[in-house]
Structure formats: structure tokens, C-alpha cells
């Protein structure tokens, strides 16, 4: 009887999920509308648990054309011990994306956070160089030809526009950027290589200006930086910035594009307390900047967001689209 009940329950869940897929696919897709307007993708994040969620997955399948692993490609997930690689979570997302015909963004190869202690404790330049090269080469090679773009280095700038202190900058200075990008280029010459950061929402902000200046120098010097990604969370008040209005998003993207990078993207978008106008401002900003190729929203439902109390996403805690969803479709 217990087994029979379980079978019935699973059948009902599967039926409900199937109906949900149909209803979502019947709606106009954010990705389809965005690409019809001339852009490459409108994406979201994914992990195995999110893709196994019968409310979340149909929205991913219907509305979003590119996927970024939220955590499972980061260093602590992929190489928690030196040479001890684990790709289970990342492989699940990659296989899903390939099966569904979606683009993939790799996130991220070097980041000061979610970094295993065995890396952060390295003090010898030659050792750290080798570790960076091995890690980057291993990850990029594993999914060569499957990942459209990699965030090679992530959040490496401080709020004053200088390099952030980390094991990478403390041991190698700014040369770690070249080392990482060259290793990634060698591992997959056709993959787009990005530098990604946050608080770049305002073109006049000190961090944005320092970032633009330094990245422009690196590109001019031959560091193979193809793209710039920005976490655009305009209304989220960081420790060193009071939050920026979405009206400045276009000027910020134009400033990033001026570095000489071949493309820019909003790689992480969640806006705490946003109005529909805020979302439309960001979408229009990308539409109006030729080099802006896409937008990745950092989550589907507020229920699953790391900032759930700020209601930062396009779907509410019941996985229902908010007014901003319709406003974006209308704007496109």
C-alpha cells in the first residue's frame, strides 16, 4: 500500500510538472524575445537541485536560453583538495544545457571567495602560478567546445578601483590576470574569456573608472580578455557603495565597452526592491549598447534567491511571474 501510494504520488507530481511545462512554454519566452531584438541570450543560473525542482525547471526550460552554474564550477566545488577534482554538480548542468540546446557560461575560474585553504595558503610565486595554470587548464579543457564563455577572474577590484588584496594579487601582483587568461586561451582558443565584477553600475564611480582604466591597459598589452561581465544589482547597498539607480546602467555598459573588449554582458542580475521600470531600464541598457550581448538573471524565484528577503527576481516565492516579467516582454 505504501509502495502504491508512492507511485500514485510520483505520477501526480510528474503530471503536474508536465502541465506546468506546457503552460510555461505556451507563454512568450524572455530569451526568444531578447534574441529577436538582436541579442545573444537571456539567461539564468542553474544547479542540479534547481533543475530537479518541478516548479523551477520548466521556467528555465521555457524562458532562459543560457545557463550559469551558481556554485558548482567554483574552486571549492571543483578542486577542494589539490588534484582532487569533483565535477558531478557541474557535469549535471552542462549535460542538461547541451540536451536542451542552451548556451553555457562558466563561472568562475579565479575568485578570492569560496577558495580552498590549500590555495589561499600558498606563498611561493612559482607554486601559485603552477596551481593556477593547472586548475584553469583542467576546467576549461573538460568542457572545451561546450561552454560559450568563462568568467576567468571574478571580483578582483576594490571599491577605490585598485586591485583587491587576495592570495593571487599578494603573491603574484597583477600578473595573475595574464597567467589565468593565457592558460584559459590555450585550453580553449574558441571560448570567450571574461573578467567579471560588481559595483560597476555607475560610470562615474571610482571602482568603475579604475576597472575601465586597468582592463583597457591589459587588453592593449595583449592579455586575451574578450569580454566584461558586470553584476548589476543597482539597488543593493554594498558595504562600500550606497547603491546605484538603474538609470545609469547604459552609461556603465558603454564605459565597460570602451576598454576595447569585444563584448560586454550583464552576467549577474538581481535587483532588490526593484520596480518594473528598473528591470526595463536594465534590459533597454543592454539593447542600446551594441557590444552588450546578453543578460543573466541570478535566480528564477525569490524563494531560492540568496537575497530572498529583498524580492530581487522576476518570479515570486510561488514561481509566478511578477509584473516586471510582463513589462520586459512588452518592452521587447
Curated annotation (Swiss-Prot):
Return the SMART domains for the record. Answer: Glyco_10
> Domain named GH10: which ranges?
45-331
Where does the signal sequence lie? 1-19
* InterPro entries listed in its UniProt record: GH10, GH10_AS, GH10_dom, Glycoside_hydrolase_SF
SS bond list:
286-292
EC no. given is 3.2.1.8
Q: Which SUPFAM superfamilies match?
A: (Trans)glycosidases (SSF51445)
Q: Which UniProt keywords apply?
A: Carbohydrate metabolism, Disulfide bond, Glycosidase, Hydrolase, Polysaccharide degradation, Secreted, Signal, Xylan degradation
Q: Where are the transmembrane segments?
A: none
The GO molecular function terms of this record are: endo-1,4-beta-xylanase activity
UniProt KW ATP-binding keyword: no
Substrates-to-products reaction catalysed: Endohydrolysis of (1->4)-beta-D-xylosidic linkages in xylans
Per the record, the major location class is secreted
**Gene3D superfamilies of this UniProt entry?**
Glycosidases
Q: GO biological process: any one?
A: xylan catabolic process
In the record, the note on similarity to other proteins reads: Belongs to the glycosyl hydrolase 10 (cellulase F) family.
Name the UniProt record assigns to this protein = Probable endo-1,4-beta-xylanase F1
Q: Look up and give the organism this protein is from.
A: Aspergillus flavus (strain ATCC 200026 / FGSC A1120 / IAM 13836 / NRRL 3357 / JCM 12722 / SRRC 167)
Gene that this polypeptide is encoded by: xynF1
Amino acid at each position: 500500500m505504501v509502495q502504491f501510494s508512492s507511485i500514485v504520488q510520483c505520477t501526480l507530481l510528474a503530471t503536474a510538472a508536465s502541465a506546468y511545462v506546457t503552460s510555461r512554454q505556451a507563454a512568450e519566452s524572455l530569451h526568444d524575445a531578447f534574441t529577436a531584438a538582436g541579442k545573444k541570450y537571456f539567461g539564468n543560473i542553474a544547479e542540479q537541485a534547481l533543475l530537479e525542482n518541478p516548479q523551477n525547471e520548466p521556467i528555465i526550460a521555457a524562458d532562459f536560453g543560457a545557463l550559469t552554474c551558481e556554485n558548482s564550477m567554483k574552486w571549492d566545488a571543483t578542486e577542494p583538495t589539490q588534484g582532487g577534482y569533483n565535477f558531478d554538480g557541474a557535469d549535471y548542468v552542462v549535460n542538461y544545457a547541451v540536451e536542451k540546446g542552451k548556451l553555457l557560461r562558466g563561472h568562475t575560474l579565479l575568485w578570492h571567495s569560496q577558495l580552498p585553504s590549500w590555495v589561499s595558503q600558498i606563498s611561493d610565486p612559482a607554486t601559485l602560478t603552477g596551481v593556477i595554470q593547472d586548475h584553469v587548464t583542467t576546467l576549461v579543457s573538460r568542457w572545451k567546445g561546450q561552454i560559450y564563455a568563462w568568467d576567468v577572474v571574478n571580483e578582483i577590484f576594490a571599491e577605490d578601483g585598485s586591485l583587491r588584496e587576495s592570495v593571487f594579487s599578494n603573491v603574484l601582483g597583477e600578473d595573475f590576470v595574464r597567467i589565468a587568461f593565457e592558460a584559459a586561451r590555450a585550453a580553449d582558443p574558441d571560448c570567450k574569456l571574461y573578467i567579471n565584477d560588481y559595483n560597476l553600475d555607475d560610470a562615474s564611480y571610482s571602482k568603475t573608472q579604475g576597472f575601465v582604466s586597468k582592463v583597457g591597459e591589459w587588453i592593449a598589452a595583449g592579455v586575451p580578455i574578450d569580454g566584461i561581465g558586470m553584476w548589476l544589482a543597482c539597488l543593493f547597498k554594498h558595504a562600500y557603495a550606497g547603491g546605484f539607480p538603474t538609470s545609469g546602467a547604459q552609461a556603465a555598459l558603454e564605459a565597460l565597452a570602451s576598454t576595447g573588449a569585444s563584448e560586454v554582458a550583464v552576467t549577474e542580475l538581481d535587483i532588490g526592491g526593484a520596480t518594473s521600470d528598473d528591470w526595463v531600464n536594465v534590459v533597454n541598457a543592454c539593447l542600446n549598447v551594441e557590444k552588450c550581448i546578453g543578460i543573466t538573471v541570478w535566480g528564477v524565484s525569490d524563494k531560492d534567491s540568496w537575497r530572498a528577503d529583498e524580492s530581487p527576481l522576476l518570479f515570486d516565492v510561488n514561481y509566478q511571474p511578477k509584473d516586471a516579467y510582463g513589462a520586459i516582454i512588452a518592452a521587447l
